[in-house]
């Protein structure tokens, strides 16, 4: 399995260095490798809207706070730790089930979160993630002890969703899903 943890933190630094008017298109470009995550949306999603809808950092208003958060994520070696967490999860899952079908390629987007969003920062502790579409994982993070202490576990958790609903796994039927599957999912 090829794991591609995107250089999204470096891209975020570049975004914060350009005029505000140029930022939306750069956010779209940063997120463009995730277009394949949504084949059911004709023409693909507007990646700026996806960024905003998944607690991504604001385009303007708190640049210095964003730079500080970005530096903390980089210092925490998030890219390397996400990849390590996925490798560790792969070893554990394939040891438990040698016939398990893994995605051929996994694209992971790590996005700096929005420190101005009260729900994101307080109720969900700076963590929003999604791994339910095979081949893609999205992690939106704000550096704090809850997030930084659990990077590998967060990545492994989302990878589990990826494998569970991938080829050979559970077929998700929202009209017939049982409560037990909802809980495990």
Where in this protein do the model-derived segments appear?
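Flexible, glycine- and charge-enriched loops at secondary-structure boundaries
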Residues: 75, 79, 149, 178
């Amino acid at each position: 399995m090829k794991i591609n943890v995107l250089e999204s933190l470096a891209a975020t630094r570049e975004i914060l260095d350009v005029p505000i008017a140029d930022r939306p298109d750069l956010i779209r470009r940063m997120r463009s490798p995730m277009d394949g995550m949504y084949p059911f949306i004709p023409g693909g999603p507007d990646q700026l809207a996806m960024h905003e809808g998944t607690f991504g950092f604001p385009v303007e208003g708190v640049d210095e706070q964003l730079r500080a958060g970005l530096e903390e994520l980089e210092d925490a070696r998030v890219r390397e730790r996400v990849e390590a967490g996925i490798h560790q999860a792969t070893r554990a899952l394939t040891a438990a089930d040698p016939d398990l079908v893994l995605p051929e390629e996994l694209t992971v987007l790590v996005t700096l979160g929005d420190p101005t969003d009260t729900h994101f920062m307080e109720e969900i502790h700076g963590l929003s993630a999604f791994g339910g579409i095979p081949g893609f994982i999205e992690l939106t993070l704000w550096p704090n002890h809850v997030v930084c202490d659990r990077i590998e576990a967060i990545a492994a958790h989302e990878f589990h969703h990826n494998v569970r609903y991938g080829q050979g796994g559970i077929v998700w039927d929202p009209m017939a899903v049982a409560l037990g599957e909802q809980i495990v999912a």
